[in-house]
């Protein structure tokens, strides 16, 4: 018993990032050497992601409602500058992907469209309609189905009602609930090394590395665009806001948010991680409690890259020449589509036919491109989520630090 306690204390003294790195390395080894054991270890990953997904909707609802209920008149949440950054970042990602698609034209071997079972949206109107319907969804269903647009809407309304009509005791109870849920999130995050070990070992055991070799160039363009956004464009946007070296903040967000998101492959599951990081960075709670859940829904630079690169690849494969005006229009469509990706089953991949329609590509061919997306999804989806989620907290921090700098001046 004493040995067990001393072992846990020894593990506790090692930083969480190092524990995650150890879990990652061990997962690669187990998944490669013993696929059967790797698949069995996947249970740890499923439990970890399941716990994060379960607690995230409750956390967002309670935290946003508590923040609005406790909000003092005269204090501002400063959400507008962050939304502007989200839109600039998403459009920059789409434009970068268009340029990369022109400079590095990619031809792909189309997979069978039968691999895709869900129906894509018929147009941009359907995407926007889906978002608006999510806004007025039943609040219980919104929490149960992790509909963050609906959760945010009802939390804002309930919080405003409590602020104007609730007693001090009621508002304090809601605040205590928010603190309790945040504590539960901290407990779950402590299991991240074990969860990531399970996720990595099962992924390696299921897919190996050979399945991705046939799409190496397509993956190189996708990942190259995402790396360029994460390491060049986003730092430039952050520098524009804070007027100092952005890379310490960028690398902190990539390390403490992006790594989690890469392995969980879920922006929703990463919301508690981003909330904890925002608190650690000393950001304004009234701001990040709203902007981070909102970012998980509308800040989709990674999705814009996926939609654009695969649409451009489809055009090149069909022998279609893409002029600059059409490419610019594709960037705009990809930006709007990406912002609605969370409201579409299948996310960014099932918005590819919408982008392909700009080039007159048939739906049958477009769905074959979607099938290719699912084949490379083990890497594409992980990198996309890591970029999307780490950018949520990065832009929130940039806007908040800019506000603090302006106030100091």
From Swiss-Prot:
A family per Pfam: SDF
GO cellular component term, pick one: plasma membrane
Cell location: Cell inner membrane
Main location: membrane
Source organism, top-level taxon: Bacteria
Catalytic activity reported: L-serine(in) + Na(+)(in) = L-serine(out) + Na(+)(out); L-threonine(in) + Na(+)(in) = L-threonine(out) + Na(+)(out)
SUPFAM superfamilies: Proton glutamate symport protein
Function: Involved in the import of serine and threonine into the cell, with the concomitant import of sodium (symport system).
UniProt-listed GO biological process terms: serine transport; threonine transport
Keyword Cell wall biogenesis/degradation: no
Record membrane topology: Multi-pass membrane protein
Molecular function GO labels: neutral L-amino acid:sodium symporter activity
Family note: Belongs to the dicarboxylate/amino acid:cation symporter (DAACS) (TC 2.A.23) family.
Residue ranges of the TM segments: 24-44, 48-68, 82-102, 142-162, 194-214, 218-238, 292-312, 319-339, 365-385
Record keywords, A-Z: Amino-acid transport, Cell inner membrane, Cell membrane, Membrane, Symport, Transmembrane, Transmembrane helix, Transport
Protein name: Serine/threonine transporter SstT
Listed PANTHER family: PROTON/GLUTAMATE-ASPARTATE SYMPORTER, SERINE_THREONINE TRANSPORTER SSTT
